[in-house]
């Protein structure tokens, strides 16, 4: 009889020695991001990276509602205003310069979208929380000035979320896909024929091929090309000019990159992720006219700060609606 001391034994080594081990994607091209700017020494839930026509970076802090403005050249950080709505989650910029801010409200039924100037003035309700039940996490404009948004409701066994399209006059809301679990990140391909959506609590990536009207799904056009692993799941995303998709992995301290067909082709790691630091990676975004990618993350669980990191992506960022 073999003694317990002589039995085969599992040890924490190699990949299993990480707080957030990478197994299925370990053979992908992998790079580690460099620190770019510390937003705060406090752990803030940073989100919503977006650049305006002048190249200024806007982002926000979900739980405290701070709207930040960063000058990429001087690294000066300003706080032009604080959201009057609870739990803002994304900033997108209209061609007219206004900030469109998605907010989650009570995370159940009081989310919406409001527009404001970069100083927080001239507030206009776009999707009003009092007349809808959406919990809006993110949005993306098309070239006509309409937009798609994600409904962040539900959980893994109660999929209440979905994706909707709002016409350029902001008067008509059309469902695109429904019955998904916490719809989160959203991106539109360069030709506006493919909509990408991340489903956080089900760990799935949706690829939705659209007809010319932008709301009808092509026959067999709604597919799930990728299932993620680990806790927590896919978050916000963006595309580059080659139609590659960059998906931040919340709770994992990394960004996964997919080609236009949904195959993983690379990943970007946040420093110290193996030790459990800076795992709350939420949003990648390109500096306009370059292939330089900015990624936000924070270290709330480890009592650390809030950072922006940077790498070069595969291609230059897509020239989105606010630059057209």
Curated annotation (Swiss-Prot):
It holds the Pfam family SGL. Ca(2+) 1 binds at residues 47, 137, 184, 235-236. Its main location: cytoplasm. Ca(2+) 2 binds at residues 109, 111, 129, 132, 134. The active site is at 235 (proton donor). Binds 2 Ca(2+) ions per subunit. Its cofactor is Ca(2+). It is an enzyme of class 3 (hydrolase). It comes from the Bacteria. InterPro entries: 6-blade_b-propeller_TolB-like, SGL, SMP-30/CGR1_Lactonase. GO terms for molecular function: hydrolase activity; metal ion binding. Keywords: Calcium, Cytoplasm, Hydrolase, Metal-binding. It is found in: Cytoplasm. One of its GO terms (cellular component) is cytoplasm. Its EC number is 3.1.1.-. Belongs to the SMP-30/CGR1 family. Exhibits lactonase activity. Acts in cells with perturbed membrane integrity and is possibly related to the membrane homeostasis. PANTHER family: LACTONASE DRP35 (PTHR47572:SF4), LIPOPROTEIN-RELATED (PTHR47572). This is Lactonase drp35. The lineage of its organism: Bacteria, Bacillati, Bacillota, Bacilli, Bacillales. The gene is drp35.
